[in-house]
Amino acid sequence: MRILIANDDGVTAPGIAALYDALADHADCVVIAPDQDKSGASSSLTLDRPLHPQRLDNGFISLNGTPTDCVHLGLNGLLEELPDMVVSGINLGANLGDDVLYSGTVAAAIEGRFLKGPAFAFSLVSRLTDNLPTAMHFARLLVSAHERLAVPPRTVLNVNIPNLPLDRVRGIQLTRLGHRARAAAPVKVVNPRGKEGYWIAAAGDAEDGGPGTDFHAVMQGYVSITPLQLDRTFHEAFGGLDEWLGGLT
């Protein structure tokens, strides 16, 4: 099995090295990742300049682009052999609920949706590395068992691991995405020369975080696994829209 590994924290981030170490004994792994932190890049592609891959001393490939660029190039000519699946992470920080709309970690996995194996996005619910071994364990466990998994084509599995030692993790729960409240207002700053700027503030707290959600699972000490799809059509709105459009003609 051949796996393409990517992330959004950057090619030198500890999480991607940990993911490689977790999977390298079970598969032929190749790493293509951004040359700098691209958190929040979502599924953006770089269209205003050429992309220049550079192989590092450890064999990883660094790219001056986004997480999606990395996977896109990896699946479309940069690699001699097409991977069987894409695995993204390990992100240092949660990708829960609405986070998946902005996450470069999730976006990298989404770009791998056309392959025969399901794509995985792994995130540790912490900015610290203390419990990376826990995330490594579950990444290895889930990816190595993927051949027994029967899911529709183009399924992306978003996995969040609680910030706990392995012996304190209570298990794995299948979850749906929760929802966050509106984010805090951007923080205004003024530099010494009087020029104004803004920092994007923290994401909102869980507004829909009850039982069954990814938020609830990790708070209770479980690994959360949420299947994602690309169809973002809001089917429940069809009735009202159909009636509204009928009244316009």
From Swiss-Prot:
An annotated Gene Ontology molecular function: metal ion binding
Native source organism of the sequence: Pseudomonas aeruginosa (strain ATCC 15692 / DSM 22644 / CIP 104116 / JCM 14847 / LMG 12228 / 1C / PRS 101 / PAO1)
Catalytic activity: a ribonucleoside 5'-phosphate + H2O = a ribonucleoside + phosphate
Signal peptide per UniProt: none
Protein name per the record: 5'-nucleotidase SurE
Residues engaged in binding a divalent metal cation: 8-9, 39, 91
Alphabetized NCBIfam families for the sequence: PRK00346.1-3 (NF001489), PRK00346.1-4 (NF001490), surE (TIGR00087)
Reported function: Nucleotidase that shows phosphatase activity on nucleoside 5'-monophosphates.
InterPro entries: SurE, SurE-like_Pase/nucleotidase, SurE-like_sf
Localization: Cytoplasm
Origin: domain of life: Bacteria
Family: Belongs to the SurE nucleotidase family.
EC number: 3.1.3.5
Name of the gene encoding the protein in the UniProt record: surE
Cofactor note: Binds 1 divalent metal cation per subunit.
Main location class: cytoplasm
Cofactor dependency: a divalent metal cation
